[in-house]
């Protein structure tokens, strides 16, 4: 439970707005105030939830909303958030009133929506409801955030545009909610008002000034919603507003479609087809108009709003500077892109809402049937007319005009002849006699031209309440060919009609004509004929249908009600008995909300209830989904005879609790049912002290809470009621009686001896609560009873503290008149005088100071005096009174805040002048060094700035200010310096113009540099274009340096376009691009790169922009420079320490950067000034993952060996040469050794990857394997470890070259070359040279991603190796063995081991 202390703090600003004693607040006023603690929305949410929880509540009448509200209010109160919080704001009666109001509105809306839709409107209604739910869900989520966005946007250009969006959205939401709960007739009148809301919302898509479309397109066209950098806060806020406005725009369309659909359906049901046509036409026009605005017309120059917004979203999403995945913007953008694409797809997929063509009425009418009048509606002398409507799948046209009237003379049921529709649409036929309500009489399918108007008359005959007449007409019409399977009202057939009218003769005949499926045929709401019969009390029909084997437990679609539910709520005992005769019946079947037929029987009365209770299998205590039993409902309905009937079963649990642990007694107390409460209390088994969960509220608590004094008084007098029971938080009935101002209850409590010093868990006594309630008269009553006026809460507050801090003047004065201690302090060291100052209680402050003037300057623990607190809360009269009483005008609290600072910050010029006149210290500053002048500047109060500048005798801005010395460490800076800096930093352009333009302070603070630093383009433009300041400024570091470093792209663009030097020194040899790189501003880097940056320029550390990007871990910038500016940079360049980019990347443990550099071919062999390669550094630093990567991915094993062996390098000791000499291979050793160097001229770039030594060694391995010769001869057994290492290294390198020839990165990643090298070395060292071939083949075999073409290429490379090397001194036998080896290698490794075979399969 939230603490009272927290509530007091949160509620303070709301409380001071409350009216003084004696003035009652309206429900709306209370709701507004309480909403500041987010109570109002909570109540609305609860009210909305109940519609789902209790939508089938079997309680009828006007009290339905009240009962449901009471139930949900009980739930809310039980949540433990009651009590003190509501007491503070006087909101204790708001939940019940507001929930009741909201519920009544929601029930009205549901009643309207439960009306059926014509076939023409069903699909439209589904589309609208589906789309509204998608759009409104996210729009509501954005709503609260949009308020915050509105408040924070100060930009002069953007703010008015956003305000238009906000104003329209608020108006739309307000009007939508206002009409939502209207009753049907009022709802219709509101929608049909001339120049009303429908017209206004239709015009929202026009480019008029007060429309919604205009500001949305203005944002898009001006580019306000596209951020220029990640710090472009304004653009992100405008983007949010654009998205919110666009969703509102879509919501408006669907709202209009919903309303026009409703109106069309309403008049269709009424039979006013002309009005139906009018709104049906409006429906289509609205859709087509909005569709054009939203998705365009398909031409390139007519893009819709959704396309334009999606373009904005994609532009933002594709901005590389955003770093989207790191700041959560990406998720939001994707969500909106998906939403708008979904909406667009939905709208585009619907070409139109209606068929555009209105049918011509070509009907020729003739009476061919021998059916004489009178029959049904056919009476001689009446005039009959017909109208038609096209229907094609889910689209319908308007209804045609009525045909000329035809007089009825002796014959009925004419034949209508019409031309066949060429587009093969169905034709609906309507009929009207005289001026009566039209009826749908049938449907003509394609290819048919004749229609006999007889089926509707059959349906009407079955509906006739006069059974004899109905049966006679039905028999005649059926004999003459009427269709018993034709459907009419809401999908009902003659079976439903006979079931409703109770015409058992017709139903009996139909049961022989129909199939079993037709007897179970549901209408559009899921009602089968037996549902209709049970709901109408036609027991005979029910019995007949049961005998014919219909489904007895079938359920309706929405509420899932069985026929037994319907009979029970109607009280039809005989029908109930017939239903119970079925062996299949389930008497305890539940509906959607878990209510059983017995729950419904509560509404049906005592007789039906008795019939239920006589059933052995009945569950008397069955609970709904929310835990309500039938006994709960009987009490809620205040029907004691029904409750008594239940009790007569001797099975009822009278203490049963619902999901919130609320009993029937609780509900009686909540609803104020005194007589019912008496009956319950007198029951022997009653537990009067059951408490709700988790609120722990008893029935007595609820009776007091809802101000039912008679019920509360009765309960308190009852011996089995605990009057001292504590609810959550330690709240007793006595506390609630004070909270609610129940004097009668308090008097009774005093009479029965209740302890008046009862304390809540936070030690609030009744007197504490009275002191901060709206019932100050209770204070004297409690004091007269001896209440302790010096009692303290856990926070040390006395009743007087609470009265003053809650703005309760009358309560405070009553306590003061009783000589309470006015010098008591609470836990914050505050006295009542502090509270009076905070809440502006002048009369209380005067009363206290008249008693003790010394408290005027008393400080609390925060060093706040009463004067300072009054100033912080802008209570002018109190401030002036304190100053007149000698209060220290320059008082400062622990943060350094003083009265002058408070009013300067708020922009109150009159009070600033007043304090100047009272000789306040104008140079006083807070702990951050901020004086009144800085506050005025930072908050844009130009009037105060000008006033201060005019008071030369009191304030001089040229004075040195040491309070902010840390901001100006190298010199003594004046107030003027900080003021100009602040004006620029906080984007106060009018004040900048005053300082620079009017006063001529061009040099102070370097305004152009500061404007560039903070990205204020308007100020930059003003200074350059109107004050003619140089774009390069007068300092060493230029404005461009500042703008680039801080990523202000638009400012960078502007400065460069106006001649700023992109290579100007920014200090330490750095230029603008270096500054941008250090902060990872890719977009700025790209722009500067395109405008003449010198990429070879080095800073004082010898670092180029490229090396800076690597050092700063700016991965995307580094890749951009390598990929796009390769001609301007040297990937292998070195700084003053001879470090390359790879060295730097290793230093910073940036594996991603290392991979990037390796990918683009950086030389891994380069050594820095300390003779270290990048791999050496990684090994020394023990960066194991980097070491592993460099070993396996760099592919330079010879260099690895050299690094490992230092001065014993193979190249230095010439051991490779010695090794090859022993093989009798002649070569130009130095050239071979240098073949890996960039400076080598021996090989072209294409051939430079071929290591001749490695090739020879690999071939030698293969030759000796297949010729069964030893690899190392006996003479070489003593060969040094270095020679063996060299051989293994070269073989592995050549093997890597073979793999590289595939250009298959995945294949290379699957081979661990370090492992290959180790195995080859081990084999050579141990003399197991035959294993080398197996090692290499095994490595190839481990590659899972090799494709057949890769294998063929691999084989080709191996087989072509002979031609790539020269063996001048090799013997013929060796050459022959070499050729045979290549063949055997292909056969044994690529084929025999199955590698190639497997890959080709």
UniProtKB/Swiss-Prot annotation:
Q: What is this protein called?
A: Alpha-latrotoxin-Lt1a
Q: Which family does it belong to?
A: Belongs to the cationic peptide 01 (latrotoxin) family. 03 (alpha-latrotoxin) subfamily.
Q: What is known of its domains?
A: The H8 helix is predicted to insert into membranes and form pores by assembling into tetramers. The helix is contained within a helical bundle domain that undergoes significant conformational changes during pore formation to allow exposure of the H8 transmembrane helix and transition of the toxin from a soluble monomer to a transmembrane tetramer.
Please outline how this chain is modified post-translation: Processed by furin-like proteases at both the N- and C-termini.
| Propeptide span(s) | 1200-1401
- What residue range is the signal peptide? 1-20
GO biological-process terms attached to the record = exocytosis
This protein's UniProt keywords: ANK repeat, Cleavage on pair of basic residues, Disulfide bond, Exocytosis, G-protein coupled receptor impairing toxin, Membrane, Neurotoxin, Presynaptic neurotoxin, Repeat, Secreted, Signal, Target cell membrane, Target membrane, Toxin, Transmembrane
What tissue specificity does the UniProt entry give?
Expressed in venom gland, cephalothorax, and abdomen tissues from both males and females.
Location in or out of the cell: Secreted; Target cell membrane
Q: Which domain of life is it from?
A: Eukaryota
| Annotated PANTHER family | ANKYRIN REPEAT AND PROTEIN KINASE DOMAIN-CONTAINING PROTEIN, ANKYRIN REPEAT-CONTAINING PROTEIN-RELATED
Question: What biotechnological purpose does this protein serve?
Answer: Is an essentiel tool for stimulating exocytosis and study its mechanisms. Its mutant LTXN4C, which is unable to insert into membranes and form pores, plays a key role in understanding the dual mode of action of the wild-type toxin.
A further note on this protein reads: Is the main neurotoxin responsible for the human envenomation syndrome known as latrodectism that results from bites by Latrodectus species.
Job description of the protein: Presynaptic neurotoxin that causes massive release of neurotransmitters from vertebrate (but not invertebrate) nerve terminals and endocrine cells via a complex mechanism involving activation of receptor(s) and toxin insertion into the plasma membrane with subsequent pore formation. Binds to neurexin-1-alpha (NRXN1) in a calcium dependent manner, adhesion G protein-coupled receptor L1 (ADGRL1, also termed latrophilin-1 and calcium-independent receptor of latrotoxin (CIRL)), and receptor-type tyrosine-protein phosphatase S (PTPRS), also termed PTP sigma.
- Show the taxonomic lineage: Eukaryota, Metazoa, Ecdysozoa, Arthropoda, Chelicerata
Q: Where is this region: Helix H8 is the probable transmembrane region of the tetrameric pore inserted in the target cell membrane?
A: 238-257
State any single GO MF term.
toxin activity
Annotated stretches, region: 4C4.1 epitope: 1026-1032
Q: Where is this region: Furin-like endopeptidase recognition region?
A: 17-20, 1196-1199
Disulfide-bonded cysteines: 413-1066
Q: Where are the ANK repeats?
A: 458-489, 490-521, 525-554, 559-589, 593-622, 626-656, 660-690, 695-723, 729-758, 762-791, 795-824, 828-857, 862-891, 895-924, 928-957, 971-1003, 1004-1033, 1035-1064, 1068-1097, 1101-1131, 1137-1166, 1170-1199
Q: Which GO terms describe its cellular component?
A: extracellular region; host cell presynaptic membrane; membrane; other organism cell membrane
Assembly with partners or alone: Homotetramer in membranes.
What the entry lists under InterPro entries is as follows: Ankyrin_rpt, Ankyrin_rpt-contain_sf
Pfam short name (any one): Ank_4
